């Protein structure tokens, strides 16, 4: 029986914790209207939030919905600011508890990890596997429509496997079941959803690593890669994975799942070899297209140098993690900044 944790609620609803949660939720958003409104009567609002939680009267408010297009179109549902304070208060207490049960090679939305740590681990594993086997193959997969597919009942059961504090479970139930989705789906844009998405695949991680004994496995949110010396081994494994995801988690793999030689593995936004890393080709095409458009916009006076500098800095930030000096120079050469007379 897995260990379950109690005596967490007092920490969640403590005034100091809610105050810290307000500051975390307000970071880089201090001048938004909803943040200013909460801050105008800060102590009163913290106490009100505290009372709503203590008396089990809190419930999620309506989400703000919008689309973003970076790197691809995504539908975002952002909770109101007061809800984000509650989310921070919960996550700050329960996340360390769930962290103890997560595997080392899960990298998304975790302190001390992240996309570049995942990329480095993937390269390290490719290098190790090549030394061990010579020829290496990779199973590269991701979950189809992951956030909209997360089953509420399965997710809540995962909370009960780790948490026994009834008050914390009440709050988790409110967030999971009353955020505007029926039976399945969690909002992209909520802090709690990042934790829930990691929790949801933790049992899968342990099944891969502990039960199947797979060493070379790396996951970043719903993207994962597995290395093997044989295509046939990976094909058999793929069938097992598909069955496990359907039966245990009500999930399906993206049809674009591939099994290919581990040369230029496309993972976490880069193409990874044992000895070097290059930018993803489609990312470069997109940047070149944007830079050409930006040259025209600058020439006609529609954007200024500050706008250009911000986009160039973003591109250089992406490129600094790979071996792409000549590529960087080639892309920047396409950016021509000249005003029309």
Model-derived segments and their meaning:
Residues 61-63, 218-222, 256:
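Short Gly/Ser/Thr- and Asp/Glu-enriched loop/turn motifs at secondary-structure junctions
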Residues 163, 242-251:
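A common structural junction motif
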Residues 45, 52-53, 105, 123-221, ...:
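Conserved polymerase palm-domain catalytic core
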Residues 109-117, 225-227, 260-264:
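Beta-rich nucleic-acid/ligand-interaction surfaces
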Residues 94-101, 208, 323-326:
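Short helix-capping/linker segments at secondary-structure and domain boundaries
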Residues 1-155, 163-164:
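Conserved two-metal-ion catalytic palm core of "right-hand" nucleic acid polymerases
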Residues 6, 79, 88, 178, ...:
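Right-hand nucleic-acid polymerase module
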Residues 89-93, 238-241, 245:
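PAPS/PAP-binding and catalytic site of the sulfotransferase fold
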């Amino acid at each position: 029986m897995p260990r379950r944790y109690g005596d967490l609620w007092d920490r969640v609803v403590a005034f100091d914790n809610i105050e810290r949660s307000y500051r975390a939720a307000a970071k880089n958003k201090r001048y938004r209207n909803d943040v200013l409104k909460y801050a105008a009567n800060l102590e009163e609002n913290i106490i009100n939030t505290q009372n709503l939680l203590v008396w089990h009267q809190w419930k999620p408010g309506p989400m703000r919905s919008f689309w973003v297009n970076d790197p691809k179109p995504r539908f975002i549902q952002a909770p109101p600011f007061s809800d984000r304070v509650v989310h921070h208060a919960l996550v700050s207490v329960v996340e360390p508890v769930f962290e103890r049960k997560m595997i080392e090679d899960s990298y998304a939305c975790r302190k001390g990890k992240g996309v570049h740590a995942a990329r480095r681990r993937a390269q390290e594993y490719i290098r190790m596997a090549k030394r061990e086997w010579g020829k290496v193959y990779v199973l590269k997969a991701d979950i189809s429509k992951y956030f909209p597919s997360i089953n509420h009942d399965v997710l809540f059961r995962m909370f009960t496997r780790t948490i026994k504090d009834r008050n914390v479970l009440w709050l988790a139930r409110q967030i999971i079941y009353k955020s505007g989705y029926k039976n399945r789906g969690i909002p992209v844009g909520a802090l709690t959803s990042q934790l829930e998405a990691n929790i949801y695949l933790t049992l899968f991680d342990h099944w891969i690593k502990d039960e199947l004994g797979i060493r070379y496995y790396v996951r970043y949110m719903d993207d994962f890669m597995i290395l093997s010396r044989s295509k046939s081994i990976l094909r058999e494994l793929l069938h097992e994975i598909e069955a496990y995801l359907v039966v245990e988690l009500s999930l399906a793999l993206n049809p674009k799942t591939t099994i290919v030689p581990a040369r230029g593995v496309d993972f976490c936004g880069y193409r990874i070899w044992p000895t070097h890393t290059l930018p993803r080709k489609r990312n470069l095409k997109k940047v070149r297209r944007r830079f050409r458009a930006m040259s025209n916009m600058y020439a006609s006076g529609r954007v200024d140098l500050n706008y250009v500098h911000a986009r160039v800095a973003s591109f250089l930030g992406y490129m600094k993690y790979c071996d792409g000096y000549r590529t960087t120079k080639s892309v920047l050469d396409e950016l021509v900044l000249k005003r029309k007379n």
